[in-house]
Amino acid sequence: MVGSGISALGLLLLMQGSVDANGIQGFFYPWSCEGDVWDRESCGGQAAIENPNLCLRLRCCYRDGVCYHQRPDENMRRKHMWALGWTCGSLLFLITSICLFWWARRQDMLHLPRFLHRKCSKLSKTVSSLSKDRRSANKSTTVLQSPGGEVETAAAVSGEDTGGEE
């Protein structure tokens, strides 16, 4: 169970890393082209400004004829940490629940408490009597006429085989 959770988390990080080619570091420290226009540092010099493809190959940002460096994206980093925290917390809760259930079953502790046992036994008797009433209501009497003209009466229960000869 733990292995499958770790594998799923590794796959998530690998897939995210293949998108922006930063790998796991790109997950924990994402970069972005967003931000204040005045805080941009130029990237690639004049050649990158004249050739947007060169700017992008240098893994820089290009906008409005300006090639500039990417900057750390704190909002995305917070979102990634939040998602990672919830994923790990949920996985830990799931593993703990499974282990606790397994332990309780081995200790033979999966019984109802005494104060609930009486209430549930009364409830099961009520449900049992209701199901008996339902079965008796489903019984019906059918009249069959044989080829010789004799009339036969047969009791049929819906959903059950009567077990008689044909």
From Swiss-Prot:
Tissue expression summary: Detected in testis and in a mixture of spermatogenic cells at various stages (testicular germ cells). Not detected in heart, brain, spleen, lung, liver, skeletal muscle and kidney.
Phenotype when the gene is knocked out: Mice are normal with no alterations in fertility, body size and behavior.
Residue ranges of the TM segments: 82-102
Any one Gene Ontology BP term: hematopoietic progenitor cell differentiation
Annotated region (Disordered), positions in chain: 130-166
UniProt topology in membrane: Single-pass type I membrane protein
Keyword rRNA processing set for record: no
Extracellular domain ranges by topology: 22-81
An annotated Gene Ontology molecular function: identical protein binding
Protein name: Transmembrane protein 190
